[in-house]
């Protein structure tokens, strides 16, 4: 471990990632009231499909998401971090991906507790995980009479910084270089999560959390994706500490509704969600994006939920012109025949490879010029 502390890690790309997510499988299963854990045979089929059809075009990662079980086996990792996802060892998922030339990205949050409270935080003199969680005697929260749907650590508690550092060290060690951390609005202000309960730990704790996360992620060279952030004060904290931020509500059933017409056009700059659709989110936050700046994440793409070729061209082209990721959620058995060509459009994917980040001619939601984007490629 001492040698690990001295290790300098190779820099990772900070360009928007191109990847595949389990989101569609899990969301559809949840809506149907069925088991959301993806069977291993389905993992294998999707990994094979991505490797064959998307990896040659730059989609180099498979990523987990919520919905599925997330557990710690102390016999595998006594530090208390997640060892199993959907009942499968994370190291097995890493190996499956690696065998096909892919990396594994993980949906997890360094503020979440997956283990026994008696677990000792690595790098401390006997500090336990239980001492990191909410303590009514000393923690000033927004809603002390409410409970939390997640078990959060409190960043200001002694040992929290070491716990967060250990989180990124653990993931780097098993081969994970992308972490998608969710429900940040619930931690900060206890709202924005569809009525899910939360105490709300406030702005100071939220900033301290992001600071520790940024320091550890930079140290171990892990890309951070901040999900469901409030983006208060023009995203001052998120753009300072994160690599990528979500700018619109969840994909859910997808389609044109999530791309451009999910209810009336509205924008809320100081709370989650800031807007309901990709188009509004990417336009409204375009002023904070740029080369070397925070990446705008418009959430997952489900091409099988769009009706026309024009709609499918639009959802891919806008995200890439805005310098955002493409997070494919179509699966090997749900992709519509002929739709792969939209994900494989090399002319548009060249924008991602270049690190291109475009801007709309206007960021006024009611000005038609917001449909025209411009920018300069290096080549």
PLM region spans:
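Conserved structural scaffold segments of CAZyme catalytic domains across common CAZy folds
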Residues: 2-105, 109-115, 325-328, 336, ...
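Active-site-proximal substrate-binding groove within the catalytic cores of carbohydrate-active enzymes
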Residues: 15-21, 210-379
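Active-site mouth loops of central-metabolism enzymes
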Residues: 24-42, 148-163, 308
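Short, flexible/disordered intra-domain loops and linkers
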Residues: 30-38, 120-127, 189-204
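Active-site groove signature of glycoside hydrolases
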Residues: 58-68, 163-195
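Active-site cleft segment of glycoside hydrolase catalytic domains centered on the general acid/base Glu
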Residues: 74-88, 155-157, 187-213
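Residue-level detector of anion-binding/catalytic polar loops
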Residues: 103, 177, 223
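Active-site-adjacent "subsite" loops/lids of carbohydrate-active enzymes
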Residues: 110-174
